[in-house]
Amino acid sequence: MAWARDEGGAAVLEILVQPRASRTRAVGEHDGRLKIQLAAPPVDGAANAALVEFLAVALGVRRADVALLRGEAGRRKTVRVAGITAAAAVAALAP
């Protein structure tokens, strides 16, 4: 998938977030990125923390293995997940 690639022993994911959704879930590909709805509001980093928590649980990795590379203040984010391949991430997150 276009939104996941392997880079240096980790998966790099291109994500589009929708904060303040009714629940947190991955909803599919949108504009070349994985769209994830987050129940958390985009206030004081709550949406970023919710994204990290969601990805860690969904991918079966520690929260410390999920790093936000770009997009801390925007809806388009680039996330690096250590200890997993892009193929495994796609299998776990594809709706």
UniProtKB/Swiss-Prot annotation:
Belongs to the UPF0235 family. SMART domains: DUF167. It comes from Anaeromyxobacter dehalogenans (strain 2CP-C). It comes from the Bacteria. Coiled coil: none annotated. This is UPF0235 protein Adeh_1087. GO terms for cellular component: cytoplasm. It holds the Pfam family DUF167.
